[in-house]
Regions:
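Terminal, non-globular segments
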Residues: 1-179
């Protein structure tokens, strides 16, 4: 997918997440989009040895920070908490599936997206508590973060890493020879 398609997917996720809710808690679809971008880029930029270069992590971090900036601007709140949390989500998702987990399991994707959603919520709430004068109820925040994380598990089960560039080129050239 091209960068324009990813940006459109992120904007659609940001527009849909306040509209879709479970038990009156909004979804956190922006984390899922950044997560998907991170693991796809980690696999696309991997070298022949199996390890990706740093550009996958940098691209995922920049994309995540851009999504966070758009989210901060759209919500009208302080600019920064979502930039930090989505940037970290992009970096971690790219790093985790490149250097920590070498074999892909779909259940692993659900667990990692659940943990990243929790970390995203904690970073956003922590940043807002630290840098602004708002008071937030602890139980309500924990409920929101846990429900959003649980709702993102099915998305994490469905997202799969992309193929490596060399594998994609080989598959494309094989298909061209036979057609």
């Amino acid at each position: 997918m091209t960068l324009a398609v990813w940006i459109i997917a992120a904007i659609l996720a940001l527009l849909l997440q306040p509209k879709l809710s479970l038990f009156e808690y909004p979804l956190n679809l922006s984390v899922a989009v950044v997560y998907a971008f991170g693991i796809k880029k980690a696999m696309q930029h991997s070298s022949a040895t199996g390890s990706a270069n740093v550009s996958a992590e940098i691209r995922a971090t920049i994309f995540g920070a851009a999504v966070g900036l758009i989210e901060d601007v759209m919500t009208g709140s302080m600019i920064g908490p979502n930039v930090l949390s989505k940037g970290l989500t992009g970096f971690i998702s790219s790093f985790v599936f490149r250097d920590i987990f070498f074999l892909w399991e779909s259940s692993l994707g659900g667990i990692v997206l659940c943990l990243l959603t929790m970390a995203d919520g904690i970073v956003v709430v922590g940043s807002r508590l630290l840098f602004s004068n708002i008071m937030i109820g602890g139980r309500a925040v924990v409920e929101l973060i846990v429900i959003q994380a649980i709702m993102n598990i099915p998305i994490g089960l469905l997202v799969k890493p992309g193929q490596k560039d060399s594998e994609m080129e080989q598959a494309w050239s094989r298909g061209r020879k036979y057609n």
